[in-house]
Structures are given as C-alpha cells and as structure tokens.
Amino acid sequence: MAEKPAAKPKAAAAKAEAKDQSDSYAIVEASGQQFWLQPNRYYDLDRLQAAVDDTVTLENVLLIKDGKNDTTVGQPYVKGASVELKVMDHRRGPKIIVYKMRPKKKTRRKNGHRQELTRVMVQSISIDGKALS
C-alpha cells in the first residue's frame, strides 16, 4: 500500500489562518440594535445615510474576540475599537402585511410595510489602529 504524503506545512498554516479569521468577531451597536459581525461577510442593517461603495466606520463596539482566545469586553464600549464597513447596496426587506379586523362591525384595515435596508460588507475589525482581520 502506498502511504499518503504528509500534509504540506503551508496548507496547514493556511487552514489555521482561515480558522483564526473565522473565529474573530465583534459585537457592535448600530441603529438601535446589536449585531455580531465577522470579517469578509455581508449583513443587512437599517438604512444608512451613505452612498454605494462608501466606507462607514462604527465606533460603538461592545465586544471584540480575535482568533487567539483573546476577548475584550467594553464598559459599555471598547476604547479605540472600530469596525469598517463598505456599503454594497440599498435594498428593501420582505413585505409584511398588517391586517386588523373588528368582528361583527364591518371594520377592516389592511396595511403593508417594507423595511429600508443597507447591505454592508465588513472590511476590517480593529482595536487601537491594529486590524484583527
């Protein structure tokens, strides 16, 4: 039987690097809500006043965890921490239908609502000017 060649150190290092990046995240406060953001992923936030392809920086960072089991918790915010986002698109959420009816009164009211959203891509998470990703 032929033995499999040992894994190359570069491949193992690349896997470890990818795992470290996937383990890093930040919890930020944006538009009255808290979001768990990871680098190189996109998220839908409430509509931001920014043009497409603009860069937005969020300073209200509540928690940062890098891939090396180092967690920084703010009180209430982490000092010197920021998350850089790139605006990809402005879109609208799914339609929600609100139907109100009073029985036996012939009163019916139907309303629809679509939330205005901004799709953003997380460019980097940094603390004290040093990027984690």
UniProtKB/Swiss-Prot annotation:
One of its GO terms (molecular function) is structural constituent of ribosome. InterPro entries: bL21-like, bL21-like_sf, Ribosomal_bL21, Ribosomal_bL21_CS. One of its GO terms (biological process) is translation. This is Large ribosomal subunit protein bL21. It comes from the Bacteria. One of its GO terms (cellular component) is ribonucleoprotein complex. Part of the 50S ribosomal subunit. Contacts protein L20. The keyword Transferase does not apply. Coiled coil: none annotated. Belongs to the bacterial ribosomal protein bL21 family. HAMAP family: Ribosomal_bL21. Residues 1-22 are annotated as: Disordered. This protein binds to 23S rRNA in the presence of protein L20. Keywords: Ribonucleoprotein, Ribosomal protein, RNA-binding, rRNA-binding.
